[in-house]
């Protein structure tokens, strides 16, 4: 197979039977590129968001705690240079096959959330028109994870274009599409955890509807704190 990240041809992942039958499994990146992603662990960093720090809680989580917003996140990987390149190709250059890179890891991680309804963070209409797919839904579909698409997002510019103060001043961007789909235990799934502003808005919206048990899951988390 030709790696979609480094474009090198990699035959090391093929079994003898696959080579004979010429029916290789659909790996889309090589082992070298896959190994460049840094897995996160709560045991080695922030106990509430998985940022890799030398304290039990990072400044971002302390900040949100003072605002009365509970932080309960789990993230698979650190947002390093390899992850930055991956998301650039997947989200902004539209290489849709890259949705399959973390399928195995997502399946394994979400098994711990039995009894939770999976809710993907939506794109705005403008964002969807530009990208033509929701990357979070693409991850879930690749892993055959059922989900409820109960949130919608207003148009209003990209979060990544805003600084800390601008993110904090943003009015509520999210609305509920169908309150009848609400459940007691919700797992909000997003791609990258940055400041927590997006998740704080979603949590506020859901808590106003009486939902208290809300957890969050991310593919990747920035290693630095935005509110320190």
Stretches found by the model and what they are:
Residues 1-228:
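Glycine-rich phosphate/pyrophosphate-handling loop used in enzymes and phosphotransfer proteins
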